[in-house]
Amino acid sequence: MSSSQQIAKNARKAGNILKTISNEGRSDILYKIHDALKANAHAIEEANKIDLAVAKETGLADSLLKRLDLFKGDKFEVMLQGIKDVAELEDPVGKVKMARELDDGLTLYQVTAPVGVLLVIFESRPEVIANITALSIKSGNAAILKGGKESVNTFREMAKIVNDTIAQFQSETGVPVGSVQLIETRQDVSDLLDQDEYIDLVVPRGSNALVRKIKDTTKIPVLGHADGICSIYLDEDADLIKAKRISLDAKTNYPAGCNAMETLLINPKFSKWWEVLENLTLEGGVTIHATKDLKTAYFDKLNELGKLTEAIQCKTVDADEEQDFDKEFLSLDLAAKFVTSTESAIQHINTHSSRHTDAIVTENKANAEKFMKGVDSSGVYWNASTRFADGFRYGFGAEVGISTSKIHARGPVGLDGLVSYQYQIRGDGQVASDYLGAGGNKAFVHKDLDIKTVTL
């Protein structure tokens, strides 16, 4: 048996045990993992500093450096809080979603159940190990994790803490060793992608190239998105203050995020639209990749107002219309163009977006509703920043990733996206041959029951 097959088999074995553990046991180990990571914050930070130093020496892109830095701002604290938030969420396993009486003493239930074994592959985001550990254990799934080489030292340190904690408290919580396994080599990943007998779902978190490569090389279902090309449309009835604040936040709050705005669509009838572009550059340092008609109108208006500065001119460049509207910049750059209507904005987004998250800024409810129904993305917002597309902000505690698929899970994937369901029938000796359709003459009752009153 190959090492990858053994890893996958061990995960399946652990998952079969984990799904039978009580919610109390699964939540308890998460609190203990939280405490252990917090207690070892210094060791984790030192490991992270090593990764950052190596990354800078090798010329890692700024967007990836920002993702790699686990102690930038409150990222580490948010990660820890996410573990506690997941622990405190309602148990996603064993929830009755449907109950139907088939006959007297014969009842059908649709009950949530873990997916099984997750293979999660991520690049330069060391906090993912904590997020996935929390979500997988809480949802009764075993997880195999592969971090990027950029975060290898942070990854190892955190993995050791997580696994030592699970082992230390196995007899107390019931959560088995093997519930979370860590792998390091690309060969392990390639081999594991062939283990469709044991692995139920692959979750890639990283670059477009990573996600597409995985989708092309495995039979295992893949949950994820390939790009984060998020657009904001400024309608003719947009509020200027809202437009400026939302656009600035969506682009500059965290440019390397997959939920950052990459495209700004502007209705030319929107009063003082140029102030939004001006604000993005002067307040946010954003470079505007503008279409020729937009750039001309922008410069003409600022020149008329005596506000066309050298800084504005340097930070406004010609858009490559063949590429820029299909591009995830992950930097302080965005593509901008005029669109003449809500319908035109919808058409542009559905043609160029990655179906991640898109927003409209308007005070016109009819236009907002048209936009939200017409845009084919996992998240569609009205008068809110695309940066809200996040499991933590949705109250999911954390997220496995963001799915742009329309099947199973869509948008930020939290606990609910990591459970499937099974059908359970609870009877009293009934056999199918007694009923119509199988040789008998008994009819089914097919009476739906109120799931709020059902106790299994």
Curated annotation (Swiss-Prot):
One of its GO terms (cellular component) is nucleus. Pfam families: Aldedh. It comes from the Eukaryota. The keyword Amino-acid biosynthesis applies. It catalyses: L-glutamate 5-semialdehyde + phosphate + NADP(+) = L-glutamyl 5-phosphate + NADPH + H(+). Its EC number is 1.2.1.41. Pathway: Amino-acid biosynthesis; L-proline biosynthesis; L-glutamate 5-semialdehyde from L-glutamate: step 2/2. CDD domains: ALDH_F18-19_ProA-GPR. It is an enzyme of class 1 (oxidoreductase). One of its GO terms (molecular function) is NADP binding. PROSITE patterns: PROA (PS01223). The modification N-acetylserine is found at residue 2. Keywords: Acetylation, Amino-acid biosynthesis, NADP, Oxidoreductase, Proline biosynthesis. GO terms for biological process: L-proline biosynthetic process; proline biosynthetic process. PANTHER family: DELTA-1-PYRROLINE-5-CARBOXYLATE SYNTHASE, GLUTAMATE SEMIALDEHYDE DEHYDROGENASE. Belongs to the gamma-glutamyl phosphate reductase family. Present with 6920 molecules/cell in log phase SD medium. Catalyzes the NADPH dependent reduction of L-gamma-glutamyl 5-phosphate into L-glutamate 5-semialdehyde and phosphate. The product spontaneously undergoes cyclization to form 1-pyrroline-5-carboxylate. This is Gamma-glutamyl phosphate reductase.
